[in-house]
């Protein structure tokens, strides 16, 4: 009896292992987890390559931010609510010398940086230049604070006012 049970167990294990390996190539995000929902939602808006994922606390609400590179070379930040799985914001990342960004920017990067650092002292570790969905331009400063927390401060490039503050929880991928 023991041999029969062991034999059946081994056959079943081999079958399920083979099935698991066979489906490994076609793994897709599952809809029941928040990250899977947000990956699907983000790629439905900008179907490119996800090169970075950040989880941040924005207005005390957990948010995923995907950096997506498109085949045409454009780069997008797509934000998705962890709670709802819905896209909440899409911003185009551009170079500092982008013509549209330069035309909209009335505040210098140095002045915007001073504003961000006045609100959150620390070391600026990254600057992004963004075109917002409403047509505005903004600077986004990633600031490493003394307590080693990373805060993101978004400064409107036209008015010089802080429009958004969020804390990074974690990051996966290239800077």
Task: Give a label for each model feature.
Residues 2-11, 16-175:
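Long, terminal "pre-/pro-" and other extracytoplasmic accessory regions
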């Amino acid at each position: 009896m023991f041999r029969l049970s062991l034999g059946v167990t081994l056959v079943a294990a081999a079958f399920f292992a083979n099935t698991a390996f066979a489906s490994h190539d076609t793994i897709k995000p599952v809809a029941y987890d928040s990250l899977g929902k947000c990956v699907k939602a983000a790629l439905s808006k900008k179907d490119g390559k996800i090169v970075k994922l950040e989880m941040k606390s924005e207005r005390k609400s957990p948010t995923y931010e995907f950096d997506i590179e498109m085949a045409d070379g454009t780069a997008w930040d797509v934000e998705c609510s962890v709670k709802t799985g819905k896209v909440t914001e899409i911003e185009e990342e551009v170079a500092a010398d982008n013509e549209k960004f330069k035309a909209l920017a009335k505040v210098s990067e140095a002045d915007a940086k001073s504003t961000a650092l006045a609100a959150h002292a620390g070391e600026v570790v990254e600057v992004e230049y963004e075109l917002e969905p409403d047509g505005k331009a903004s600077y986004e400063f990633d600031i490493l604070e003394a307590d080693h927390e990373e805060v993101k401060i978004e400064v409107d490039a036209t008015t010089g006012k802080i429009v958004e503050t969020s804390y990074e929880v974690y990051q996966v991928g290239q800077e």
